[in-house]
Amino acid sequence: MKLGYSTWGMPKVPVDEALAHLAGLGFDGVELTVIPGYTTELSKLDAVERSRIRQLLQKHHLMLPAIAAHSSLLSNDKETHAANMARLKGAVDLAVEWAQGDIIPAIDTTPGGKPAEWDAVRDLLVERTRELVEYAQARNVTIAMEPHVGAVIDTPEKVLQLLALVDSPYLKVNFDISHFNIQGLAIEETVAALAPHTVHTHVKDERGLVPDFEFLIPGEGDFDYVTYLKAMQAHGYDGFISVEISIMVQRRPDYDPLAAATLSYETLSRAFIEAGIPRK
């Protein structure tokens, strides 16, 4: 396994500064975020900037396991849905451009919606997910669906049902275990269910249970990263463990995105060592 970091927690940090900082800390890779409001927003990436970022990744010896393009697939507004689908498909095209040899970044997204809507919108979600996956499959790109607390897919069972209904090897899971930890689900339970279907991950720290919970920077809470890493390895996962800093943390008045990355690296790199898992 390798250690990565998502620029989700760095919306206003110039990409040059972000990549230099992450490489300097020792991260093995990065997930670049391309949604509106970020310095790497998809609509702002012209051909010159795309080429420049690819060269920056090479310069800093950073792998690109995933691109964060989180956009709802369940908007009832036709224009909004069209814009969301265009962004996701544009991210697929970007993944092809930013491929590193035969390593093509996955496209991470969340489904949108609310948990109680599952039965009502499942067929629509399958239809729209299938459209996206077919577009991605034609380009050899994998879509990584992320179960998310408060979203229509918020449990392992739901995301596994979606995978079965779409039935494509190009639809896998972006596994953020924090969304299950705050629901009181055990590490072994969720890892056993999802690791075999996972193409990319997110980790963060957390405190409390739904509805009284907060997401934290790795190292601020009590999440047992060593047990988690050992479980992921035991269930056959050998990809990236990527830190994601939540919007909840980013709203802090004293939030420092570079300091958050530093604490995250210290916490996770130590956990890899304590777990006896080499980063390779």
Where are the regions a protein language model picked out?
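Histidine-acidic metal/acid-base catalytic patches
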Residues: 1-4, 11-28, 51, 58-61, ...
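Active-site beta-loop-alpha junctions enriched in small/polar residues
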Residues: 6-10, 33-35, 69-72, 110-114, ...
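Residue-level marker of alpha-helix boundaries and capping positions
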Residues: 8-9, 44, 82, 122-123, ...
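Active-site acidic/histidine proton-transfer and metal-coordination neighborhood
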Residues: 17, 51, 55-63, 73-173, ...
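Conserved long hydrophobic alpha-helices within structured protein cores
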Residues: 22-33, 84, 88-97, 242
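Short, well-structured secondary-structure segments
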Residues: 30-34, 63-68, 105-108
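Glycine-rich, proline-tolerant flexible connector loops at the mouths of alpha/beta enzymes
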Residues: 33-54, 111-113
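A short acidic, helix-capping loop that chelates divalent metal ions and anchors anionic groups
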Residues: 36-41, 73-78, 113-118, 182-184, ...
